[in-house]
Amino acid sequence: MNKGKVDVLLGLQWGDEGKGKVVDVLTPKYDVVARFQGGPNAGHTLEFEGQKYVLRSIPSGIFQGGKVNIIGNGVVLAPDLFMDEAKALEASGHDLHARLHISKKAHLIMPTHRVLDAAYEAQKGKDKVGTTGKGIGPTYTDKVSRNGLRVGDILDHFEEKYAKAKARHDAILKSLNFDYDITEVEKKWLEGVEYLRQFPIVDSEHEINNILKSGKSVLCEGAQGTMLDVDFGSYPFVTSSNTICAGACTGLGIGPNKIGEVYGIMKAYCTRVGAGPFPTELFDETGKTIRDLGHEYGAVTGRERRCGWIDLVALRYSIMVNGVTQLIMMKSDVLDGFDTIKACVAYKQNGVEIDYFPYSIEEGIEPVYEELPGWKTDMTKFTSEDQFPEAFKNYISFLEKQLETPIKIISIGPDRDQTIVRK
């Protein structure tokens, strides 16, 4: 942790790496927690005082009393879903109103954005990207084409701005011959807009830079993972924002020289939700076993996650584009019972072995594996790295050598206490 710096925490795979738990472990050390991109399509699952929460838009530092949490300009916000999420937290005793600040420049997901999402996916037929249907893509499209509604717009002449944006969407949907009725959804959405007005709506870029100037520390969290980044992920099967470290600069309004540590989170294996290429995917009983042991189902959608062995080619690429300084390995305990662990160290692309992540991994990619002995030990009760079995220590050393980055934190179970910080 660096005073006067922003430390960035992000996923290195296809999302669902376990960022929620890690943020919960790290936040006590920081003064402020900020979210820099994404929307309610991805959820962080956290356990706090025996209760499970899924946070979609609200930063995970909200459980730490007295800390300011900021929703940055790079986030897209659905007022109705935000209201549900915030009210559920308030009902469980967490006072948000003074501590949760929302950027004026964050874009609003409108009800018609969700309809557009469904209409565009229906048009694609068998080429569907597999969106969550939450309207994320169309909202970012409006942002880039300079047609978006922002949180700051709810403070002045909102009805007029909303009617204009909605009319534009209606015209597009009419041209697509897509039938819809948003009467009930819109009613709740407008309630959400009113609810949003109760929170501090701020110039977050000024706020964060002033916080840094005063010598305080900021932990910045992203949603999803590097391999879903719109520029560097497995395009077109990606999200609509920059999930990488550089997205923290554009999504919060901070300079690159303000970035301190970059924590990269990975699972001890690999998962992916929805459509898209996945070189190490397992279609056999092993894949099913990993899914069952790891409870690999989407926090928001409930969708089954596709499971496979760890992909070191993709991880090396993720570490490179993010400038990762420390690795955090999640769900090591899921592999506790395996005789043999596999790790993909290279790809064969159309028969030629390569050790880098290529332009496309959609076709002709075959994983090249190294096999390592499993540790066959229940590690969930361990409290120190000194207790790790030799085979697991060897697995860690192997990964660190392959990835050329230290693994500083290892998770051996879902609870906050089941976290080993290495010396």
Language-model features: locations:
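Non-transmembrane, aqueous-exposed alpha-helical and coiled segments at domain scale
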Residues: 1-423
